[in-house]
Amino acid sequence: LTLLLIGIIRLILPAALINPGDYVLMTTPGYPVFGTHAKYYGGLVHEMPLLERKRFLPDLKAVPAEVLERAKVMVLNYPNNPTGASATPEFFEKVVAFAKEHRLVVIHDAAYAALIFRGQPLSFLSTPGAMDVGLELHSASKMFNMTGWRCGFVVGNPLLVKAYGDVKDNTDSGQFLAIQHAVAEGLENPSFTKRIVSKYSRRMTGLVRLLKGLGFKARKPGGSFFLYTASPRAAVSADGSRVEFPTAEAASQWLITEKLISTVPWDDAGAYLRFSVTFAASSVAEEKEVLEEIERRLSDVKFEF
């Protein structure tokens, strides 16, 4: 079953699913809104860290038994924000088995599913048994560069979609029809998204190259428009002056105040910075200029990691 939605699904779903005392299993770092709203309804959040050595996939076996006894929902997001990591069919198979064993609802936030640089998009619902336990959320905002227009759809287990729809019917009155027509046009013309993916892939390749040249251990992700890389511990200027970064937050603040380069810091599961390739540039030449400017601003210091 599929239901069209506007951009408030993560706010509505907790109202449909969470009772006081229920646990939500959330990945960290990650987009926290579902967990935040679950708390409004008396829910609790258990964080599952995403570690580089585990390919930024959560360790399901590490969830404590006392949490699983009260767990109701597990929220996943692949390709992942902020890590850019992609899930595998084998991982999703483990998720389905885990959800059935512990009677969990799986919400897979697939906002970036179409933005992949290799292979074909992977839907959680393509996993055998996933329709028994899950929902998948899709975002036209990311798929067609329609951020701010707030349109997408939810698909999955009919009972879960109905539960969402019952709350949604009393929450909003639907999206502006012209935006719905625009989304339909995009869905009927996948070449739109292919061009967007090609642009992001090209920019990501350039960003990875320049950051590696500056000492970052940057690697091109499997998808999304985010580049997640270990934060530097210090920056040393040509005159020998040194700035220490005890946290990713400190490094991010230095980058924006001293170099006018915006990043998002994460200190939840190691110190990392999230770069993005959504900068404004209307041509390949302008993209090159932006990347060269980033390199110029950072080339007068040596980063230590």
Task: List the predicted regions and their residue ranges.
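PLP-dependent class I/II
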Residues: 1-305
